[in-house]
Amino acid sequence: MALGEEKAEAEASEDTKAQSYGRGSCRERELDIPGPMSGEQPPRLEAEGGLISPVWGAEGIPAPTCWIGTDPGGPSRAHQPQASDANREPVAERSEPALSGLPPATMGSGDLLLSGESQVEKTKLSSSEEFPQTLSLPRTTTICSGHDADTEDDPSLADLPQALDLSQQPHSSGLSCLSQWKSVLSPGSAAQPSSCSISASSTGSSLQGHQERAEPRGGSLAKVSSSLEPVVPQEPSSVVGLGPRPQWSPQPVFSGGDASGLGRRRLSFQAEYWACVLPDSLPPSPDRHSPLWNPNKEYEDLLDYTYPLRPGPQLPKHLDSRVPADPVLQDSGVDLDSFSVSPASTLKSPTNVSPNCPPAEATALPFSGPREPSLKQWPSRVPQKQGGMGLASWSQLASTPRAPGSRDARWERREPALRGAKDRLTIGKHLDMGSPQLRTRDRGWPSPRPEREKRTSQSARRPTCTESRWKSEEEVESDDEYLALPARLTQVSSLVSYLGSISTLVTLPTGDIKGQSPLEVSDSDGPASFPSSSSQSQLPPGAALQGSGDPEGQNPCFLRSFVRAHDSAGEGSLGSSQALGVSSGLLKTRPSLPARLDRWPFSDPDVEGQLPRKGGEQGKESLVQCVKTFCCQLEELICWLYNVADVTDHGTAARSNLTSLKSSLQLYRQFKKDIDEHQSLTESVLQKGEILLQCLLENTPVLEDVLGRIAKQSGELESHADRLYDSILASLDMLAGCTLIPDKKPMAAMEHPCEGV
């Protein structure tokens, strides 16, 4: 007990000495710490043994002339207006007067805490009596032993804002010479084992609010950069630390006149993060009552709005349809790995940049390089993080159409094949329906299969329209999984021709009756002619006169297929006129066979499979013209042969003299030249003769069948005429009331004459 009382008395005496020294020192000199003044960036004071908070010179609160000692390790020095430059010394060098009010060095930390509590009570009383309007800061430090203080968990600091008694009016004491106060670094207690520091993380917000209310002139707040070191809030409470040799080390901080700068500094990373999440515009809201409303388009726009690849302004709707398609830039990010292209290969071309981006900027874009995040200032003035690809207009591209980059190349590769197939179906096989025979532009009579395939492949390679235009939405949306059709479609081309022939088979003349005989009576004395042009279109496309050069022999001959086509329809044989259902009034006259043959197309197919004729075009001739040409050439050849025979018969052998030899040699040269000139004529006659002979041989059964039908038709027509005459006589007998006997004599006339005749 005695020791406790002695300690209390010693503390009281020391407290009075500190108070008296504080009052006296306030009037003598002002402690000026070398360093930055008000308005400069405050440095951070580092000393041996621990970390000391910086001294902030801030304008704002009218400071008291002196501070009463509030803590054993707290500030016990006050400052005065400048008196002389000689008195400006660091606090560390003038430690003798400051240590007069401190407890002895033999005190421990426990005793120091007890003395600190009692000292706090005395400080409250003394400050409330003498300086009612001054700042009292109870227990602002925490003494630690062996490590830095961490006051975040200290419950005493939670009551720090309530313990602060801030006044906005200057004190009424006689110390009017002081208009501002500065937080002063005073030497700490000798018994303090380590430096003291305060972490402002838990009390920063509350102290900041009190500081704003306490500063009517809006002093600048010091903002400490984010680090792992404890920092001191911007309050008039300076923390005192012990350090024999203080060193000033500048600390980069941000200073401003308002508290919003601190919020921006603390929330810079949050701004970078939320800039990618918070959009700058409202979500898409199209008019669902409009006839142009597309739910799929609205869903895609909503996906692009919700999950953007990169933040930024959206592209206007009127530019959406004219932006080149790109699967990487225009997809919403969902299922991005489904594309077969990589972003690196797609973004290496400056053409993928939005039209809003100028060419100079497009050429300067880093399309390749490490994918490190970089900060880029966007039009919204918000720093946003972007990948190393560096497309400034990443989100300004359209987001609806798919497609894209390499897909266009694949489409261009298969486009000629697809359009070539269309040309084969629409252009290469136009049917000339005005002609009497079903024809196509590329073929008359069918040629061997190799030639047909060559012409089909040539039609497939026709140049397509190279007009520069934007692809339609159907072309853009076409899927690459559907491969192009092969170039040679002989089956399809033949099927089109066959379907065209079927369509013409239905369109028969109105005068024709179902079941009419295909062979009708001619108006000439010759044999019956074939059907007219209206029924001639019923011929299958494969029915044609064909030579022996056909390698496969699939196409039947013209006449045979014509007859068999009608045989399959149930009209294989000629019956009676009653069975055919043809009356005498419906019998029509048709052109004769030469006129029909004159309109039949005939080509000169090459027997050996070579290209037909000169120029590669297939000649189109009628059968009659071919026969006429053959006859003319044959007649010419025969005349020439007669002349040659006369020359050879009347020729004489060469004599031994020189003149005879010269004449014989000249005659030989003329004869040889004549033979060479007529060699082509001979070959043509032989070729056409072989073709006609082959046609006759192949059509011999058909001709025999036709001749037999003609013979039967004549007899049937006679029988039909007789039956028609008998029916007429029968009608007359019924009118007269008489019946005719088989020998065409009236039976009633034999018995009694008919009355009324």
UniProtKB/Swiss-Prot annotation:
| Biased segments, Basic and acidic residues type | 1-17, 86-96, 405-432, 439-456
Cellular component aspect of the GO annotation:
cell junction; centriolar satellite; centrosome; ciliary basal body; cytosol; nucleoplasm
Compositional bias segments (type: Polar residues): 125-144, 339-355, 457-467
Q: What is its main location?
A: cytoplasm
Q: Which GO terms describe its biological process?
A: centriole-centriole cohesion; centrosome cycle; protein localization to organelle
Please describe the post-translational modifications of this protein: Phosphorylation by PLK1 is required for binding to BTRC in prometaphase. Phosphorylated directly or indirectly by NEK2. NEK2-mediated phosphorylation promotes CEP68 dissociation from the centrosome and its degradation at the onset of mitosis. Ubiquitinated and targeted for proteasomal degradation in early mitosis by the SCF(BTRC) and/or SCF(FBXW11) E3 ubiquitin-protein ligase complexes. Degradation is complete by prometaphase and is required for removal of CDK5RAP2 from the peripheral pericentriolar material and subsequent centriole separation.
Q: Where is this region: Disordered?
A: 1-47, 67-158, 192-259, 311-480, 509-551, 597-618
User: Would you tell me the protein name for this molecule?
Assistant: Centrosomal protein of 68 kDa
> What is the source species?
Homo sapiens (Human)
Per the record, the gene is: CEP68
